[in-house]
């Protein structure tokens, strides 16, 4: 199985399966002498960790990360050496027996059939590499990526659950840490609690839309045509389990706008442009034009489908091609979009780190 690595200069390779001994990643291309502690990585992992509320899978994984290489102690603290940084997270709460009854059946909505079609076999124990368990390693890599681009802040929020959207006039980043949904709208978070409780108790699931905003991104990251910043962001976000759509800025909403409404007008800044660039009067472009960052906040949204593992019986076929029914046991998220928030942040941080290093390598410090 190839294609377990993403990035060009900042490269991340992930490994491990949902019910294997461990999962982990190797981060290559991290500059030397960056302050890095295991506590900083753990802080991001704890935001994604399962079992923290009744609205996520009850699989109890501590997700304690170990740094195996690429850092050393100095007089000023622990820093990166420039060597590959290997990170390991042990799996401690696998229950493979939950999947023994369906090992020969293809779960609708999962990658069971496609893995079997491609490789001739699949890991039925929690989905193996196709499990969202793999995304913990991306969050760990993202914690390192956050340190590379000076002055950049990457934050995510759940802005829609099922058909229910937040009120953007009530957006408050401080609210995200106060509810289990990463929701910036206090009133909508209260609604989501009762709404998802009903879905959870029925054994069903629901989808969500996540928005990631990167502020402080310098102008000039990305390149035309085949190395567009938004192209790489879209690919990175689409690589997350259960993601079925990505948009940048106004996204598909731009199709409803006129040219006058969509184009982000500009005015001269007090610094007479220079490296700070002009002042934009709107941000329908999501901080990217021609594949290159404008200096505005980079805004991306992605849609997460409902968890395919639900308690109601479903029609399917087995490995012999016979029609059958399937009943999925195990522990699953009623809305996998909740824990996708820190994963989306991590992927955006990794892409920005990669493009920052590529930009610096091509044009030098500016």
From Swiss-Prot:
Pfam entry (one): Chorismate_synt
Cellular component terms (Gene Ontology): cytosol
Cofactor binding: number and manner: Reduced FMN (FMNH(2)).
CDD domains reported in the protein's UniProt record: Chorismate_synthase (cd07304)
Biological process (GO), any one: chorismate biosynthetic process
Quaternary structure note: Homotetramer.
Family stated for the protein in its record: Belongs to the chorismate synthase family.
Role noted for this protein: This reaction introduces a second double bond into the aromatic ring system.
Protein name from the UniProt record: Chorismate synthase
């Amino acid at each position: 199985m190839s294609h377990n690595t993403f990035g060009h200069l900042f490269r991340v390779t992930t490994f491990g399966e949902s019910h294997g001994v461990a999962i982990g990643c190797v981060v290559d291309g991290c500059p030397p002498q960056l302050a890095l502690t295991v506590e900083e990585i753990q802080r991001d992992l704890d935001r994604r960790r399962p079992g923290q509320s009744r609205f996520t899978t009850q699989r109890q994984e501590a997700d304690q990360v170990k740094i195996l290489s690429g850092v050393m102690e100095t007089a000023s603290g622990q820093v990166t050496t420039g060597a590959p940084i290997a990170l390991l997270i042990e799996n401690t709460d696998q229950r493979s027996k939950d999947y023994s009854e369906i090992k020969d059946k293809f779960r609708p909505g999962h990658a069971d059939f496609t893995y079997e079609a491609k490789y001739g076999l699949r890991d039925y124990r929690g989905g193996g590499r196709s499990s969202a368990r793999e995304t913990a390693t991306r969050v760990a890599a993202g914690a390192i990526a956050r340190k590379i681009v000076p002055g950049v802040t990457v934050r995510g929020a759940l802005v829609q659950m099922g058909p229910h959207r937040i009120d953007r006039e009530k957006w408050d980043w401080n609210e995200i840490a106060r509810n289990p949904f990463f929701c910036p709208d206090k009133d909508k978070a209260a609604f989501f609690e009762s709404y998802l409780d009903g879905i959870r108790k029925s054994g069903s699931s629901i989808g969500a839309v996540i928005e990631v905003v990167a502020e402080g991104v310098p102008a000039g990251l990305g390149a035309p045509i085949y190395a567009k910043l938004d192209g790489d962001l879209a690919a990175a976000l689409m690589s997350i389990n259960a993601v079925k759509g990505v948009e940048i800025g106004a996204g598909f909403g731009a199709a409803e706008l006129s040219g006058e409404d969509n184009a982000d007008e500009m005015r001269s800044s007090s610094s007479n442009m220079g490296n700070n660039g002009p002042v934009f009067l709107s941000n329908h472009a999501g901080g990217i034009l021609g594949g290159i960052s404008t200096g505005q906040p980079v805004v991306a949204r992605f849609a997460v489908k409902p968890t395919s593992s639900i308690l109601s019986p479903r029609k399917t076929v087995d490995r012999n091609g016979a029609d059958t029914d399937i009943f999925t046991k195990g522990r699953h998220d009623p809305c996998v979009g909740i824990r996708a928030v820190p994963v989306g942040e991590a992927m955006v941080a990794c892409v920005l780190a990669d493009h920052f290093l590529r930009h610096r390598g091509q044009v030098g410090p500016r």
